[in-house]
Amino acid sequence: SPDYQISQSYVPHTNILSTNFVSEENEFAVVDFMPCYHLSDASNCYRPAEIYRYIRRIKGTPRFKINYEPAPDYARGKTIFNTTSEYIETYSTSNSKDRQYLYSSLPLHNILEQKEIVLAKDEFLLLSYNEKVIPVNIEREKLEYCRTLVYWLNWTDRTKKFTVYNDVIERSLLVLKLMSFYNGAV
């Protein structure tokens, strides 16, 4: 919206992106992250094919719309939407096995119809390649955020520090870590 001044930055020492929307009367932040953390066995890292979006109300009653237009299977076919009470399932007519699930604390029909949303409290969205068997709610989202934050802070704390260009080097290391496989290949 032209009413908002928008700024983006990473949460320091992490791969968690924060986008801030500020106007005279309203302010909110959109925090995007892919979960990444160690399970009970410290050698294994949990990295599901998921993206969380946490929408944090800071002041006022911000208004916005969500433009959800997925193009599964590289947009080779028409996108099919199936809405349940828990999620929006999407897949392509060219490959019905490649499915995505959008979970949200916001009304799903408002997302699909791109209706204006009034942010009265913190909300979340989760885009996943897997249907969830456990309940997806804002408490689960906050837990995933905390685990991911701790993972990245611990990881960057263990990296070498440089006296010159450390911020740029650390950002490069974080991006490379995101793109690396479990065996170390990039």
Predicted regions and their residues:
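Acidic, mature catalytic/reactive cores of soluble proteins
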Residues: 1-186
